[in-house]
Amino acid sequence: MLALWSISFVLLCSWRLSYAQYEHLGFAIAYQEPEQDLYTPPELPADTPRIQLRLAGEKRKHNEGRVEVFYEGEWGTVCDDDFTIHAAQVICRELGYFEAISWSPSSKYGKGEGRIWFDNVHCKGKEKSLAQCESNGIGVSDCKHSEDVGVVCSDKRIPGFKFVNTLTNNINSLNIQVEDVRIRPILASYRKRIPVTEGYVEVKDGGKWKQICDDEWTQMNSRVICGMFGFPGQKRYNTRVYKMFARRRKPSYWDYTINCTGKEAHLSSCTLGHTLSNSTCEEGTPVVVSCIPGRAFAPTPMTGYKKAFRQEQPLVRLRGGAVVGEGRVEVLKNGEWGTICDDNWNLLAATVVCRELGFGSAKEALSGGQLGQGMGPVHMNEVQCSGFEKSVTECSFNMEKDSEGCSHEEDAGVKCNVPAMGFQQRLRLSGGRNPFEGRVEVLVERNGSLVWGTVCGEGWTTMEAMVVCRQLGLGFASNAFQETWYWPGAVNADAVVMSGVRCAGTEMSLSHCLHHGEYLSCPKGGGRFAAGVSCSETAPDLVLNPQVVEQTTYLEDRPMFMLQCAYEENCLASTSSATPANSPRRLLRFSSQIHNNGQSDFRPKISRENWVWHDCHRHYHSMEVFTHYDLLSTNGTKVAEGHKASFCLEDSECDEGIEKRYECANFGEQGITVGCWDTYRHDIDCQWVDITDVKPGDYIFQIVINPNYEVAESDYTNNIVKCRCRYDGHRIWMYNCHIGGSFSAETEDTFPGLINNQVTHR
């Protein structure tokens, strides 16, 4: 069997690898694609009007949109009057989906054009076509396009669904409706490559795979196909070899040709061309595409595939996404990173971003800060792209009002198509109470055979767990377990096959992390000491407010006898032990305001029964190491430090409309709610750095929150604030405070120390 990639349609759905693809990963799995019942197109009574349906509109997924109907040579819409889920069910099934999830009134997906073909629709849910439902009559309506109805269908397609164009002679703009599409490698040199970049383009229609005739096939069509499979561009290939191959075998052709403009994010957004006579391609051969992979997915002669994915684009980056190829869009302007407002944000603009970063077309254009809110300026608003720009910065936008009327609640994001690398097949979670948790088991080669085994739990941290959850497509890590009580996935899967794992947290696969080679080291062995994880679709994102730090800094000379609590908590310099009770310590004091801009609440790692009571502060502390305060020399050497070793986490204030959930008083629950912030005032214990022994001069002040990565976040790079400061022996000036990574690399280079919160030893 030859290798293939499969995608469920209409529009792009989900990746699934065939048995043959597993072989190309270097191993095979005893898996057979289930046989599907042959789909039988419904037979409609002769008096039923013949219509075609499609989903349209902006800011939508592949399986949702405004309902549009083609009748008598014209596309039109459906009015929302009397519309119900039963009508949505009929529409979704007519489009080849299993069922309807919901429907939306009042032109949620934008206003359509042309006639309103259906009004006051009454369906029972069992009809085979929308035309069989009761209505005012086709074309009889008193509605406006502000009442256009939309539907959301299930991702799952009807097996064997066959598109039947009953209006072939009258329609030239019908969207393509097929079960699946794939790139099937033909040449031996491409059959073992991952990802598959070259081969026949085939569609699955009526349960059978068919080639497409290259008659009238264009580079724009190839551009769309490559984008769907996660590739930013296409290239020419050796046509002579494929013509020789086609002559040796008799292809089975699809009934239609395809017309794409090159702007489409998916093949299903292209339109049908002419119909082939007798399903033959007399003057041509099967369509072949050859795609160019992005840098993160391209093999190199010396190192093979890149071990970790890093955004290296100078003008655009993604932040806050759970997997490679998704995130909040940030652009660099005037040396400072900022976000894009979601006004007019659509798939065209999102696709430009995705291709610019080395991915394919966009699966989704996200709005409303769905992947967390950014900080700093909003650089672009009302972005309009043609779809062929090299960078989103080349698109037109409203230059007069970059951020006018926009807040970070409107930050735009993207989800891009990425190549299927097969990483999910080399890892699994076993024994969990749900698919999001379990013992980590990896597939490795031992003595010429492929075996499942465990990962040593010693030294297992949140960073390794983050890679596991990303590799499995399960979001973010919520817990990393060094000791587990999960059942094994198989009787013989108890042996430790990987140890010494150390990840930076950005890798696409656990095998890309540093780990012991052939000689393992796991003193406690596997079993209950095997590594485990629990994953979550969302995560918090803590961000410090640099302006608060800059505006609240001052010096205080405080006598030692007033610092007993601080001394017990080790918040003073080591020389304080020799300081007489009446002698002062010089303290650099400041306030810090920690915002949760993520998608879920920030909660302490340890359970409340393990919180520590502090008599000095009269409340429980839930995290022993939550923040590091450091004073650095201009070359990055630490000259003083302040550890507010114990913290009580609570909601000090919240954005409008958000209620506080956490407070320290009365043994209350602790944490920071999404949209709230925890303020540590300058006048509380340990909210300082002891600079008694520091000489006058120029320094860098640095704050890092969640420094040990004890709690998973969607973005660790924004957990640091840096400031320039000048100390003359009596006064201190704090200036240029900013979040790490918020400026260009050239600017960050002038601030030694941590560029972001990625520590060097990992």
UniProtKB/Swiss-Prot annotation:
InterPro entries found in the cross-reference section: LOX-like_protein, Lysyl_oxidase, Lysyl_oxidase_CS, SRCR, SRCR-like_dom_sf
GO cellular component: basement membrane; chromatin; collagen-containing extracellular matrix; endoplasmic reticulum; extracellular space; membrane; nucleus
Domain of life the protein comes from: Eukaryota
Subcellular compartments: Secreted, Extracellular space, Extracellular matrix, Basement membrane; Nucleus; Chromosome; Endoplasmic reticulum
Catalytic activity line of the entry: L-lysyl-[protein] + O2 + H2O = (S)-2-amino-6-oxohexanoyl-[protein] + H2O2 + NH4(+)
Record region (Lysyl-oxidase like): 540-742
GO BP terms, alphabetized: collagen fibril organization; endothelial cell migration; endothelial cell proliferation; epithelial to mesenchymal transition; heterochromatin organization; negative regulation of DNA-templated transcription; negative regulation of stem cell population maintenance; negative regulation of transcription by RNA polymerase II
Cofactor note: Contains 1 lysine tyrosylquinone.
EC top class, as a word: oxidoreductase
Cysteines paired by S-S bonds: C79-C143, C92-C153, C123-C133, C213-C281, C226-C291, C260-C270, C341-C406, C354-C416, C385-C395, C456-C522, C469-C535, C503-C513, C565-C616, C571-C686, C648-C664, C654-C676, C723-C737
Cofactor list: Cu cation; lysine tyrosylquinone residue
Protein keywords: Basement membrane, Calcium, Chromatin regulator, Chromosome, Copper, Disulfide bond, Endoplasmic reticulum, Extracellular matrix, Glycoprotein, LTQ, Metal-binding, Nucleus, Oxidoreductase, Repeat, Repressor, Secreted, Signal, TPQ, Transcription, Transcription regulation
Effect of a null allele: Morpholino knockdown of loxl2a and loxl2b in the embryo results in increased expression of Sox2 in the central nervous system, particularly in the eye, hindbrain and spinal cord. It also leads to impaired neural differentiation with morphological defects in the brain where the anterior brain is rounder than normal and the eyes present a flatter curvature. Embryo development is also compromised.
Residues that span the membrane, as ranges: none
Region forming the signal peptide: 1-20
GO molecular function: calcium ion binding; copper ion binding; protein-lysine 6-oxidase activity
Covalent link location (Lysine tyrosylquinone (Lys-Tyr)): K644-Y680
Binding locations of Ca(2+): D541, L542, E713, D715, N718, N719
Domain SRCR: residue ranges: 53-154, 183-292, 316-417, 427-536
Description of post-translational modifications: The lysine tyrosylquinone cross-link (LTQ) is generated by condensation of the epsilon-amino group of a lysine with a topaquinone produced by oxidation of tyrosine.
Role description: Mediates the post-translational oxidative deamination of lysine residues on target proteins leading to the formation of deaminated lysine (allysine). Acts as a transcription corepressor and specifically mediates deamination of trimethylated 'Lys-4' of histone H3 (H3K4me3), a specific tag for epigenetic transcriptional activation. Shows no activity against histone H3 when it is trimethylated on 'Lys-9' (H3K9me3) or 'Lys-27' (H3K27me3) or when 'Lys-4' is monomethylated (H3K4me1) or dimethylated (H3K4me2).
Family: Belongs to the lysyl oxidase family.
UniProt name for this protein: Lysyl oxidase homolog 2B
Organism annotation: Danio rerio (Zebrafish)
Designated gene of the protein: loxl2b
